[in-house]
């Protein structure tokens, strides 16, 4: 029975120092399930931890509900040496005789059952049955601190089981949602989702009602409907989807084939734009007339021209602070809004850099 409970607790192995085991074993998390994880991953039997920790460990050492170490002198203090085998057996007997010992074992086995394969579940269930069949131990004297210790450890294991169960429950819920969505998609073709084959079979039987004598075999019984090929449902679903969405898919395919890659203009058009850029580098803001001329010479539309100049100015052009300004003869209000959004000046045409 002790071997089946050997993975409960935290701390080091049996060969670890009593002081180190005491520190890791006693500080039981009462409200945070996250801290419980740190205890679960490193195996140590409950009676081994208690033996290594010493009797003082469940008598107020480090517990949030007790003052700092006023019980240490009861059993020789926290800084004493390792306890004897007799004292360890005494602590073990007290824990095993406690009324909550069976609840502690049950909480531990519940943690082990989470996500376990069927054969392990069967073994754990048998172990739990054996433990339930044991007569309860005799708890002679009331020990409030041991009661608190047992209750805290049961709470810790219960919270840890919740942490273990949560991701499994979430995964099962996700799978159910996916299954429901797949059933909905399949139901669009057959109207029955996962049970579409059964519905098709039922439809076949209903069509036989009131049919002619050709549907009867020589014995007078109705002919059995033919067995449905499992792959026939998938083929039918594929056919229905293609029939319904083939036009839309065809238009998408044509659109993707015609669509040019983003930012990749024809080489000849880019060369003409770069040539204009080099000639007007001091003020690379083409007027509407120049944009129309560039569109005619490059074969691009106005949007492509505008986007190219915007990107080119952002990446490769920065106006000089001491660059002279010259008042232009004319003002082009049609360019003002574009420059206000793109350039460092308030209006295109109001000021233009001198050549």
From Swiss-Prot:
- Entry-linked Gene3D superfamilies: Homeodomain-like (1.10.10.60)
The cysteines covalently paired via disulfide bonds are none
- Biological function: Probable transcription factor that may be involved in shoot formation during embryogenesis.
Q: Which spans does this entry mark as compositional bias, Basic and acidic residues? A: 218-233
Q: Which family does it belong to?
A: Belongs to the TALE/KNOX homeobox family.
Q: What is the lineage of its organism?
A: Eukaryota, Viridiplantae, Streptophyta, Embryophyta, Tracheophyta
Keywords linked to the UniProt accession: DNA-binding, Homeobox, Nucleus
* Species name: Oryza sativa subsp. japonica (Rice)
- For region Disordered, the annotated ranges are 52-82, 207-233
Q: Does the keyword Nucleus apply?
A: yes
Name used for this protein in its record? Homeobox protein knotted-1-like 12
């Amino acid at each position: 029975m002790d071997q089946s409970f050997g993975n409960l607790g935290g701390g080091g192995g049996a060969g670890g120092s009593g002081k180190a085991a005491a520190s890791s074993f006693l500080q039981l998390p009462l409200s945070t399930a996250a801290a419980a994880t740190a205890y679960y991953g490193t195996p140590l039997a409950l009676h081994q931890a208690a033996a290594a920790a010493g009797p003082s460990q469940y008598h107020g050492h480090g517990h949030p509900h007790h003052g700092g170490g006023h019980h240490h002198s009861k059993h020789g203090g926290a800084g004493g040496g390792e306890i004897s085998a007799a004292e360890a057996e005494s602590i073990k007997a007290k824990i095993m005789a406690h009324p909550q010992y069976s609840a502690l074992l049950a909480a531990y086995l519940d943690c082990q059952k989470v996500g376990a394969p069927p054969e392990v579940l069967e073994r754990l269930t048998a172990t739990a049955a054996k433990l339930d069949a044991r007569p309860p131990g005799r708890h002679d004297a009331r020990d409030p601190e041991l009661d608190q210790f047992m209750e805290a450890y049961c709470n810790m294991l219960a919270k840890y089981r919740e942490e273990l169960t949560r991701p499994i429950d979430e995964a099962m819920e996700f799978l159910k949602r996916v299954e429901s969505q797949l059933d909905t998609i399949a139901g669009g073709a057959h109207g029955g989702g996962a049970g579409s084959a059964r519905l098709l079979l039922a439809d076949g039987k209903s069509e036989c009602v009131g049919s002619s004598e050709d549907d009867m075999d020589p014995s007078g019984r109705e002919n059995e409907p033919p067995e449905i090929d499992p792959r026939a449902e998938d083929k039918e679903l594929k056919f229905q989807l293609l029939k319904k969405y083939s036009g839309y898919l065809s238009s998408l395919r044509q659109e993707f084939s015609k669509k040019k890659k983003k930012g990749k203009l024809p080489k000849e058009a880019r060369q003409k734009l770069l040539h204009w850029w080099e000639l007007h580098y001091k003020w690379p803001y083409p007027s509407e007339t120049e944009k129309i001329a560039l569109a005619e010479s490059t074969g691009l539309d106005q949007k492509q021209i505008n986007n190219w100049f915007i990107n080119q100015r952002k990446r490769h052009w920065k106006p000089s602070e001491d660059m002279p300004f010259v008042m232009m003869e004319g003002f082009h209000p049609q360019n003002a809004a574009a420059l206000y959004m793109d350039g460092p000046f308030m209006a295109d045409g109001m000021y233009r850099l001198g050549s």
